[in-house]
Structures are given as C-alpha cells and as structure tokens.
C-alpha cells in the first residue's frame, strides 16, 4: 500500500512543471533526511570537492555552523557554512551560509557534476589522471553557484514571486502568497512551525545592510543565504 502511494505521488510530480517538480522533490528529500545522513553529505561534499580541486590553488570547506544543529528542530535552523580558502596562504577569500534546502540543492549539483568530471578524467590520456585539469578554478565556480543559490531567494509557495517576507524559521514568501495563508493559519506553510504572536509571525525584509544581515543570521532570525562573516 505504501509503495502504491509513493508511486502515485511520483507520477503526480512527473506531471508538474520542471521547476515546481524539482522544488517538491527537494522538499520531500529534506523531510526524510536523517541527521546522520545530513552529516554524511557534508563530509561527502568536502571529499568530492577536495578530489576535484586537487592541485588547484583554492578549495572549498563545508562545515555545520556551531550550535545551529543542536535543536530538536534542526532541519529548520541548521546552517552550513561554505568557505573558499587559498591553499598557499590559508586566507579565507569568501564565505557563505546556507539553510538545509539550499545545501541539498548544492549537494545535488556538485555530486552530479563531479560524477561526470571523474568519469571523464578516468578515460583521459593524461598520465596523472588529475581531475583538476578539467576546470582551472573549480572552487571559484562552485562558490559562484553557492552565491546564486543564496542570493536568488524565491517564494517557497509559488516559486515565482520574489521573497519579501521571512518567518523566524527562515522560510521566505512573497506578500501575495503569505497573505492568503495567514488569513486562516498561524504557522509556517512549509515546516508548520507555530507562531506565538503577531509581532513574530510575518517579518518584513526591508533591504537591510550587510551588518544588519550578519547580526540577523547570528540571532537565527534571518533568512539563509547572506554573506557569512566567520
């Protein structure tokens, strides 16, 4: 019976527009992800990116932000910090912070790309078989993808409008969608986190400065995807 429901769900997803189907798949995957699997994926990204960028000047480091995974609702508040480091100098050149949804998107992008790169390098005639020769600065390209994911925040409901409202759980919505939802509900449409008062229910993102954003992130009330300052 369970398998039948799962098959029917997948059939419905397959009929959705590609962008919406991708969003639904990512939400389902994040919902079933265990904490151990999550940590495994963080470690896997570190291994994969290190292998692909071997011999290059820069590399990426993925870390769970300390304290962000200690809650029973870790999927809502956990943050993954992605840092680009110059190997020779040890200088941190860029750092971004992602929520779980953004991290899963990046994980899929990088592992999919890495599989192709490693397959290509295995058939290469180069004697060292160094996959880093495929792309001269892979870390910078990946960091660009992280920036894209964290800058282009969309409404979690319609996946079309620009998110201009953020809840304390860090899920973002456009004004039109959240107005319809909040008429009858006092919780987040995505994670169902209850809002205890009107003053915390719907927080308007009002083009804050970088300093405002940094402080907002540290207070765990900001949306993911803003520049992270270690």
Swiss-Prot record:
Question: What membrane topology does the annotation report for this chain?
Answer: Lipid-anchor
Q: What job does this protein perform?
A: May be involved in spermatogenesis.
The protein, known as:
RING finger protein 141
The answer, when asked if Cell wall biogenesis/degradation is one of the entry's keywords, is no
**Biological process annotations from GO:** protein autoubiquitination; regulation of DNA-templated transcription
Entry GO MF terms: ubiquitin-protein transferase activity; zinc ion binding
Zinc finger (RING-type) stretch: 155-192
| Record InterPro entries | RING-HC_RNF141, RNF141-like, Znf_RING, Znf_RING/FYVE/PHD, Znf_RING_CS
Q: Give UniProt keywords alphabetically.
A: Lipoprotein, Membrane, Metal-binding, Myristate, Zinc, Zinc-finger
Which Gene Ontology cellular component terms are annotated? membrane
| Residues linked to a lipid group, N-myristoyl glycine type | 2
